[in-house]
Each structure stands twice: as structure tokens, then as C-alpha cells.
């Protein structure tokens, strides 16, 4: 059977090769296609075999059935050449310059396979310089998938798209439709006004007549008054039309006196920094409308609003979230272990690393895996992830390790880098000025075999990726673990935890309300305002704190060492300038437990709203100041 299959394949190749030779030698030619006055001799049978359009043409009994020459209108000669080459050689030669014309020809000839290849090529090669052309091309021919994908890309990257020359060539009605939309991902309305003025100036003689209509769609009351004055000085055409002058004068009045009903904000203007309490258990958030057991709590400390995002534990994702980090480009990363179902299908247990898509898809996808360990820290610098220390199983023994592995997101590979100066587990890591700082944790002790096998660490270790080198910096006053850590105004805040004063020599440990603040420039620690009560992080190697707009927030935690204690559902705020803790929210719609607190810039439109019945029941969930 295998021999027959191979024989059929070779038979097909031989047939294709012979037909191609016949075309090149112009043997048995029975039709000539003409496009842009260029002639293409070929065979009706081949055309009809690949194209339903030509099959219908040659079998319908009309004039084309007997004509030797067939003129193709509105199709380029290059696209006909490319498609004929595909028919006769199975090679489709498309590139950025010809893909749209080839796609148009394939659409015209009803060649779905070729059109699909062109469509996928355009999706894969879409960027800010060409997405607008792809969008209007797709709309023109009715390619819904391509139109939807290019529209999403255009709207999401509009700030960058507006700086490219392609957008200056669109029609007035097309620009008008774009700038009417609330869904543009721009943070400042100034960029819309700038685009309108550049578009008009690109061909002022023909486009000035559209200025008033376009200007009405610019939300001028959202623009800085000084920017608007500069625009007037630089574009005298705004002063040559009475309607333009009226629009701008009304805008200045609106800027000075905020309206009762201000203009709608565009999508990008709503993006803000949120506290994300990632991970959850099956209890804690129940609603009569739906179960929120598969969602994670989010909180906007500025507006005091609650949102939810899908949890990485949902479905076939992670069974356990161990820790997480937000990268420099705002990518949200979590690491943990696979679900029991997936583990049963895997040969080995790994660290599973997932990332979140915050626009359009709203789901978690697997990024990579790493050699399994527990109680590790996860850090990031630029576009690299670092799995640091932890506890590994070596020859059936669990040992605390000092190894550090780096994952390059760009290159999709792992590399072992310089190890920690000591073995560590249950430690924390933060990034300041492109350097990693590893804080506290456990380290094994061998000197006193009759005592605890592990000692708490008060060390602060700094890693410089440019040197691949660790340095020990000034130690903390307390040796500790189960604390929270965050960076505020380039300083490291270490909050609460379990620990003891000085180096751990076996002295009594206690729950801490202590705040220690490290200044990297001066390499010194200072004492911060004590927390309202001793507080432990929810996980031994993850933080329950994050910084937003120069303020520090702690989202829940344990008030004691009892692991069965219910989470505190308060959010604490520390303003470094006031040097005082405030409770800014109580009874928040948080799960009974979560895994790691992260801070990322997200848009509320992409998030899940809170259940209305719980908002009604817990009317004070937004808290009090």
C-alpha cells in the first residue's frame, strides 16, 4: 500500500512537470489570457481544474467557449503570471508588494486556496505601516476574517498607525469613520487633531473643504489648551473659516468650564494601572448570575472600582499558580503547575509559565516550561524571565538550590546564568533600574544538625545581567520570609512577614508589622511606618502588594501564621509622602485566597464586570478613606 501511495505521488509530479514543459514550449495551447495587454498562453483544462470561474466560462456554451483570447479586466499582469505559475508548478510567489493584487485575482477567479494563502500572509505580515491598506482592501472584496483582523490591529495600534504615511492617502469618508470611533487605542486626543491637520495639509487644495466636518469629530474639549493654541498658530487654515473658528472657540470655553456631559473617552484613554490578585480558589465569590470561581479579582485604586479577569486556573490551564511578574512591556506572566488532568498525560512535572492576552482574546496562553522546582522566585528584566533558587528534587531528595535560569522571550530559549551566592527558597525578587534584587527567604544550615534545617535570611542580593554577576548589598534588619515586596519611586519596600531581628541564629520568630525601605542608590535601609497589624503574604514566595501612581497597596493577607485563617479582605494604602497607612477598601469582592498580587496597565473594557447582586449586597465594598 505504501508503495502504491509513493507511486501515485511520483505520478502526480511527473504529470505536473510534463504539463509545465508543454506550457513553456507552447504545445497544445488552446487559450490565451490577456491582462494589461500582456498575453499568457495556457491550457483551458488547467485553468478549469483550478478555477471555478474559468470552468464556468469554458463550459457555459457562451462566446468564451470558442474564443482563443480571453481579456481579463481589472487584474494586473503580474498577478496573472503568479497564479499561472502556481497552477503549473505548485509554487505561489507572493511578497509584500504583490500580495493584494494576487489576492484580488484569486478572489476574482474563485480560487479559495490561493486566496486563503494570501490572506494568511497579510495577517502574518501586518504592521502599523500597512494595516490600514489591508483593512480597506478586505472591506472592498468582502473578506470578513481579514477585515476583522486588520480592523482590530488598526484600532489597537492607532497611535502608531497615525504616524505612517499610508493613512494620509485614505479618503475623507474613511478618515471620518475612523475618528468617530470610541475604540481607538490612543491616550491623548491631541494625536487625533494632529492627524486631521496633517491629512488636510497633505493635499490642502482638495481637502480643505472637509476640514469642518472632520474637526467636528475631534473631541477638542479633551485637548490641552496650549496645544490647541499652538495648532492655531501653525495652521492658519483654521482661522480662514468661520465655522472652524466657532468650533475652536467653543472648545476653549469647554476646556475652561468642564461640561456636565463631557465627550466620551476613547479606548486608550481608559487604560489604567490595576492591582491584579491572580489565582483563586473555588469559593469566595458566588453570584446568582454566574460563578466567579474562574475569575481573578482586579482593583482600580484611583476610581475604587472592581473588575475581574479570567483566571489562569480556568479550564485546562494551571492547577496551581505559584508566582508571577509583569514584564517591562506590560506582559502579565504567571508560573505554576499543570492541572491534575494534564499532569496525568505528561511524562514529567515542570514549571508551567503562562502569559495573558489583554486585548481581543482575553485568555491565558502557555509561554514555556522550565525544570521543576518549588518555592522559587520569578523576576524579569527587559524581555527576559528569571527563575531564581527554590527547592528541587535531586536523587529523591528535596534540596534548596542556588541555580538561576534565564528565559529569552524573543529567542524562546533557556540559559543557565550565574548562580546565587547561597541556596535560597521562599525569597522575593523585584527589579529596579534593570537589576534584580533578591530579598530574604530560607537558606539551609548544616552547622547545628539538632536544630531547624533552615535559617531565615536577611540578605539582599543584586544581580546585574550585563555582568552576569551577583553582589551582596546592605542586609535587612530582620531575617524573614512570607513578606510582601514592591518598588515605589525606585525604592524597595519590604512589608510584614515572619522573622526575627538580625541574623537568624535560632532565636524566636514572630509575625511582623515592620516596613523596611531600601534605597539602591545609597545602599542603605530605613524604617518605614509600621503596618496597622502584622501581616503575612498569602504565599511563601509571592507578594500581596503592588505600587500604583507612586503609592503602595497591600491587597489582603493573613494576620497570623495559621494557614487556615481566612484572608483579610481589606486594601491598605501607603502614600510615601504622608508616611501613613490608610484602609482604602473593605469587604472587597476578593476570593477567600489568591496567589500573587501584580500591577499591570489594563483597560476596563476588556475586563469582566463585577456581579451586580454582590455589589448591591456589599455596597461598601469600595471602602472608605
From Swiss-Prot:
Alphabetically ordered keywords of this record: Kelch repeat, Repeat
A family per Pfam: BTB
Residue spans of the Kelch repeats: 384-434, 435-490, 492-545, 551-601
Record-annotated BTB domain positions: 29-96
All residue ranges annotated as the BACK domain in the record: 131-233
Protein's recorded name: Kelch repeat and BTB domain-containing protein 12
Organism for this UniProt entry: Mus musculus
Gene: Kbtbd12
Amino acid at each position: 500500500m505504501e508503495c502504491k501511495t509513493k507511486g501515485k505521488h511520483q505520478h502526480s509530479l511527473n504529470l505536473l512537470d510534463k504539463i509545465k514543459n508543454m506550457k513553456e514550449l507552447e504545445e497544445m495551447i488552446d487559450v490565451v489570457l490577456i491582462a494589461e495587454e500582456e498575453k499568457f498562453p495556457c491550457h483551458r483544462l488547467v485553468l478549469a481544474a483550478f478555477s471555478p470561474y474559468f470552468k464556468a466560462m469554458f463550459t457555459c456554451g457562451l462566446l468564451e467557449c470558442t474564443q482563443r483570447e480571453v481579456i481579463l479586466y481589472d487584474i494586473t499582469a503580474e498577478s496573472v503570471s503568479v497564479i499561472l505559475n502556481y497552477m503549473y508548478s505548485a509554487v505561489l510567489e507572493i511578497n509584500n508588494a504583490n500580495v493584494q493584487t494576487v489576492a484580488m485575482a484569486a478572489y476574482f477567479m474563485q480560487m479559495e486556496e490561493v486566496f486563503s494563502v494570501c490572506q494568511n500572509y497579510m495577517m502574518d505580515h501586518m504592521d502599523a505601516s500597512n494595516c490600514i491598506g489591508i483593512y480597506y482592501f478586505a472591506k472592498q472584496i468582502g473578506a470578513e476574517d481579514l477585515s476583522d483582523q486588520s480592523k482590530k490591529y488598526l484600532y489597537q495600534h492607532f497611535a502608531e498607525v497615525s504616524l505612517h504615511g499610508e493613512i494620509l492617502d485614505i479618503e475623507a469618508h474613511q478618515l471620518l469613520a475612523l475618528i468617530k470611533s470610541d475604540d481607538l487605542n490612543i491616550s491623548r486626543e491631541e494625536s487625533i487633531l494632529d492627524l486631521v491637520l496633517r491629512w488636510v495639509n497633505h493635499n490642502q487644495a482638495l481637502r480643505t473643504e472637509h476640514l469642518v466636518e472632520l474637526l467636528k469629530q475631534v473631541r477638542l474639549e479633551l485637548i490641552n489648551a496650549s496645544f490647541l493654541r499652538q495648532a492655531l498658530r501653525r495652521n492658519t487654515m483654521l482661522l480662514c473659516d468661520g465655522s472652524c473658528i466657532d468650533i475652536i472657540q467653543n472648545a476653549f470655553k469647554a476646556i475652561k468650564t468642564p461640561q456636565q456631559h463631557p465627550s466620551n473617552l476613547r479606548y486608550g484613554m481608559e487604560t489604567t494601572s490595576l492591582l491584579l490578585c491572580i489565582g483563586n480558589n473555588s469559593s469566595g465569590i458566588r453570584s446568582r448570575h454566574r460563578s466567579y470561581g474562574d475569575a481573578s479579582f482586579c482593583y482600580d485604586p484611583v476610581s475604587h472600582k472592581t473588575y475581574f479577569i479570567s483566571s489562569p486556573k480556568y479550564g485546562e490551564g494551571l492547577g496551581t499558580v505559584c508566582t508571577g511578574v509583569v514584564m517591562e512591556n506590560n506582559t502579565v506572566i504567571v508560573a505554576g503547575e499543570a492541572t491534575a488532568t494534564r499532569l496525568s498525560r505528561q511524562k514529567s512535572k515542570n514549571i508551567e509559565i503562562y502569559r495573558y492576552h489583554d486585548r481581543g482574546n482575553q485568555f491565558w496562553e502557555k509561554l514555556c516550561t522550565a525544570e521543576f522546582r518549588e518555592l522559587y522566585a520569578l523576576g524579569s528584566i527587559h524581555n527576559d524571565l528569571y527563575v531564581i533558587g527554590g527547592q528541587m528534587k535531586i536523587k529523591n531528595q528535596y534540596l534548596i538550590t542556588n541555580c538561576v535560569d534565564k528565559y529569552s522571550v524573543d529567542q524562546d530559549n533557556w540559559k543557565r546564568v550565574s548562580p546565587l551566592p547561597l541556596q535560597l527558597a521562599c525569597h522575593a525578587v523585584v527589579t529596579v533600574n534593570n537589576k534584580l534584587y533578591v530579598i530574604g527567604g530560607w537558606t539551609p544550615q548544616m552547622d547545628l544538625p539538632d536544630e531547624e534545617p533552615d535559617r531565615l535570611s536577611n540578605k539582599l542580593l543584586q544581580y546585574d545581567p550585563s555582568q552576569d554577576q551577583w553582589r551582596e548589598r546592605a542586609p535587612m534588619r530582620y531575617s524573614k520570609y512570607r513578606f510582601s515586596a514592591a518598588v515605589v519611586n525606585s525604592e524597595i519596600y519590604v512589608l510584614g512577614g515572619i522573622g526575627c531581628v538580625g541574623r537568624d541564629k535560632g532565636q524566636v520568630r514572630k509575625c511582623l508589622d515592620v516596613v523596611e525601605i531600601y534605597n539602591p542608590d545609597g545602599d542603605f535601609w530605613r524604617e518605614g511606618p509600621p503596618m496597622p497589624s502584622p501581616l503575612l503574604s498569602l504565599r511563601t514566595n509571592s507578594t500581596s502588594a503592588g505600587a500604583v501612581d507612586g503609592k503602595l497597596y497591600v491587597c489582603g493577607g493573613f494576620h497570623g501564621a495559621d494557614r487556615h485563617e481566612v484572608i483579610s479582605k481589606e486594601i491598605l494604602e501607603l502614600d510615601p509622602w504622608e508616611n501613613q497607612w490608610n484602609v482604602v477598601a473593605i469587604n472587597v469582592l476578593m476570593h477567600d485566597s489568591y496567589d500573587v498580587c501584580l500591577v499591570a496597565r489594563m483597560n476596563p473594557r476588556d475586563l469582566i464586570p463585577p456581579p451586580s447582586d454582590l455589589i448591591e449586597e456589599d455596597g461598601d465594598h469600595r471602602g472608605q478613606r
